[in-house]
Amino acid sequence: MPVMNMISETVQSLYSDGVQRVGLLATDGTLQAGVYQQELTAHGIDTVCPTQAEQAEVMRLIYEGVKADAPAFDTTVIADMLVRMEREGAQRVILGCTELPLGFDRYGISRQNTVDPADILAQAAVLAAGYAIRN
């Protein structure tokens, strides 16, 4: 089995789908390192990132919501951010931290037009192993 890069697989999937602009949600460190942005730019895909206040709320969702196993979480800022990203032309939003899809599901945030890199990597691994993807 070849070594697979989740970021590369995610960006390649978006590129293959003709996506030209994406929103990117991730931890502070991932955003600051620019690992998604570099790969997206190399494929001609523009990135819409959270504002500073929105990013603080993304981090709160990850750490005070999902990791703390909080039973409830106010998702207003996250929902408004997704609307803003779409308004700014984002065709998809990458949930670039494994806790984000969990938080979206747990707290009822719509996953419409979101991309889970772990799902894309799993599908790529199945295909690389010579199997078909079942729906």
Q: What spans do the regions from the language model cover?
A:
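Non-catalytic structural scaffold of enzyme domains
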Residues: 1-135
